[in-house]
Amino acid sequence: MPRILAATAGSFVLKAYFHRWRSLVILALLLAPLLWPLQYFAERYYSEQLAEQNRQTLDLYVANLLGTLRRYEELPQILGGLPVLRQALQQPGDPLLQKIANEALADIRRRTGADVIYLLQPDGTTQVASNWAQADSFVHRNFAFRPYYREAMQGRLARFFGLGTTSIKRGYYFASAVKEGSRIIGVLVVKVDLEHIERLWGNSPEQLLVIDNYGVVILSSREDWRFHASRPLSAAERDEIHANIPYPVQDPKPLRLQQSAWLSQSRTLPETGWTVSIYAPRTLIERPVRSVLLIGGATLLALLLLLTLLTLSRRHYLDRIALEAEAKRQLEERVLERTRELENANAQLQQEVHEREQAQRELMRAQDEVVQAGKLTALGTMSASISHELNQPLAAIRSYADNARVLLDHQRTEDARGNLEQISDLTTRMASIIAHLKAYARGARRAPENVQLQPAIEDALSMVASRRRAMNVELLRDVPDAPLWVQAGETRLRQILGNLLTNALDALAEKAPPRRLWVIASQDQHGVTLTLRDNGPGFSEDALAHAHEPFFTTKTTAKGLGLGLAICDNLLRALGGRLEMGNHLEGGAVVRLHLLPGVPGVAAMPQEETRA
């Protein structure tokens, strides 16, 4: 009898356990579909995060690419005015002159970092080139078939990307006509090597590519994508490719990409007609999504196990409740203790999740700030600022040279000698400006010096005097006769004043006469204030809000890069001063320079000039 009861009880227990586990399996199957919305939202979240990251990366690389191109954009026009190059075109039979021109281009190429600089005759034959002494010299080679030659001969600034037929190297070409009056006497070409940008792209996990106006990949972080067509080419496009030879292949093969495997973003560059795209593999999304699914599955499993434990505990409690009350009390205490542990663990987990999310937000914000600071630093130290800073002394040199020519025609040699001395002083000043800008790019800091303000004002006014008189601008000065000593540097102070006076004349050029320019200096217990005012159109609200930012300008690209006020602001800050801008109540712009007071009668050695 006891054996029968025991067997019956055992069979009952087995059926009960089987029933419980079957219920748990059914519950698990019902909860499993909850992982699908978890996967959907996880993919959406990480896709948005990756898209934002790709956008920032694309902005950074686009800024780098445009910065590289803009660095050389105006170089052909500037070099086209060099007398030695003009003489080389006018006297092609003079071997000594040709050698001097070749060496001049080679030196300019080394200093600017360009790949090749060469000068074409009107028929497209290379007269002089920076690589004249190399095996792949361009001298005596004809490039009349190139589109940049044809566009430059039409008087336009030409752009072209293609494969060099002589060097077999890819490059971006800028070309500009060299004119003698209205007659085109040649074409100056600057070739820029962009392969270093590809090498920079190769260090990132994303894949970047640049597509030209034909739809062909010309730059890419993957070599097997280069010179493949991203879309079908028309017959006319194929004919142009055969005629211009922009690629090492005459018939680009289609670029076969499995779009579903990539997350892409693109940016069009109107200046070049290119499209820059970034491709990130979707595996960057799949990995964190799998982690989320694993965590979600583990959470569901933990819930099932918890339900199992609770069910078994409850069943055990119900089975034994009739046998002993003490066991009931102990079981209740155990369940309560376990519940408290789970609650504590859950609270701790929530706290850790909150801290992790907060740390992630802080990290992303810090990364955004670092990226923005890196872009401003890279853009602020580009050598484009050199051409901007040299515009004023170059314009003054041209004016003095034109006046000297007229004076010599009238046999006024003493006056002409004075102009030549002014030109010599300006070239010394240009060398000092270049030395200072190099130190500025390296982040060097020199202590301010005790200098007089009046000589710097006179120098800056003399640099723009010819243009001011030509524009019929009335100069109104209110500067004390007693020396005003400030803490500055002579070169830096002249740079700042020259930039601001040039900006004032640019603004007055947009206004009909009468034109007036005020220069006012005053001193108080806080320092020296120099005020420059004009009766031009004044600053707009947008200009006042962004004037201190690099590359912000209301001028066209040919008239300015937007670096002048940013450079003046940085120089003044380095001197302990500040720059204020506003509009006068009677109309026109007002710019105030606040400078720290210097020690009267104590002039330090001009470190900027001596070290230049």
UniProtKB/Swiss-Prot annotation:
InterPro entries in the record: dCache_1, HATPase_C_sf, His_kinase_dom, HisK_dim/P_dom, HisK_dim/P_sf, Sensor-like_sf, Sig_transdc_His_kin-like_C, Sig_transdc_His_kinase_DctB
Ranges in a coiled coil: 328-376
UniProt-recorded Gene Ontology molecular function terms: ATP binding; phosphorelay sensor kinase activity
Source taxon at top rank: Bacteria
UniProt PTM: Autophosphorylated.
Main location class: membrane
GO CC annotations on file: plasma membrane
SUPFAM superfamilies: ATPase domain of HSP90 chaperone/DNA topoisomerase II/histidine kinase, Homodimeric domain of signal transducing histidine kinase, Sensory domain-like
Residue ranges constituting the Histidine kinase domain according to the UniProt record: 385-599
A GO biological-process term: positive regulation of organic acid transport
Phosphohistidine modification, residue list: 388
Keywords per UniProt: ATP-binding, Cell inner membrane, Cell membrane, Coiled coil, Kinase, Membrane, Nucleotide-binding, Phosphoprotein, Transferase, Transmembrane, Transmembrane helix, Two-component regulatory system
EC class: transferase
Alphabetical list of Pfam families matching this protein: dCache_1, HATPase_c, HisKA
Location relative to the cell: Cell inner membrane
Membrane topology annotation: Multi-pass membrane protein
Transmembrane segments: 23-43, 292-312
CDD domains: HisKA, UDM1_RNF168_RNF169-like
Catalytic reaction list: ATP + protein L-histidine = ADP + protein N-phospho-L-histidine
EC numbers for this chain: 2.7.13.3
SMART domains the UniProt entry points to: HATPase_c (SM00387), HisKA (SM00388)
Chain's role: Member of the two-component regulatory system DctB/DctD, which regulates C4-dicarboxylate transport via regulation of expression of the dctPQM operon and dctA. DctB functions as a membrane-associated protein kinase that phosphorylates DctD in response to environmental signals.
Protein name: C4-dicarboxylate transport sensor protein DctB
Gene (name only): dctB
